[in-house]
Amino acid sequence: MAAGRLLLYTGLSLALCALGMLAVAICSDHWYETDARKHRDRCKAFNTRRVDPGFIYNNNNNLPLRASRSRLDRWEGKLLRARNRRQLFAMSPADECSRQYNSTNMGLWRKCHRQGFDPEIAALIRKGEIERCTYIKYHYSSATIPRNLTFNITKTIRQDEWHALHLRRMTAGFMGMAVAIILFGWIIGVLGCCWDRGLMQYVAGLLFLMGGTFCIISLCTCVAGINFELSRYPRYLYGLPDDISHGYGWSMFCAWGGLGLTLISGFFCTLAPSVQPVPRTNYPKSRPENGTVC
């Protein structure tokens, strides 16, 4: 009896902690973060380089450090041609610096400039010229598509916008359903604990496991959406330079922690009724005599 009660109380406590962690993750804006300080410093150094006639600027990528094609065998020639093809379609430093990259942090609802990472952006925010945070759209809008592009590229961007929109909707929708199911399971578990009903405790555990499943779907969809945004075409519009560091923030880890606590609480609440002994009644069982029950 004591072991079952301990499992039940532990499961309900972990479920309550999981609800708190998921609520913090949903309300915060640190699911995904970027740091563009190195890129900004490199672009400043590139724009302030010497341009006088007596100075010759030679990029490291153009230094003659490779052998001639006549001395390469067939396999090395293929590798060299593939590398030349990649360099042909890659962005030059001037093209990368022509587009402004900011240090941002993003959540389910907003995308914000990170505080203390860009003094120029911070000054514009203090003046009120730009907003620190912008809300993420969950509806399709053609205003975000550039106008001066070819028809095929515009069609590809439009299709990618719909796909990214579906991924964002799935992430927010499944996360909301997960929190609602876990909250409903916690209420059922508390009522089952007060009324000493093993079936209600078992149902609460199943609801916790179901909520954890929805949470897994939401987090996996969020990761897939971020990877899709980074691999969109054309790369010069949606890709990130190599010197911009990016990764998941503490909100994402808070959501994964809530997922783990939800699954553990579901296991404990499902196991608790089987540990408790079956209540015995003081009334004797009726026995059949001559085809009738006495």
Swiss-Prot record:
Signal sequence bounds: 1-23
Listed Pfam families: Claudin_2
Localization per Swiss-Prot or TrEMBL: Membrane
UniProt keyword Transmembrane helix, yes or no: yes
Coiled coil: none
Membrane topology, record value: Multi-pass membrane protein
Protein name, per record: Transmembrane protein 178B
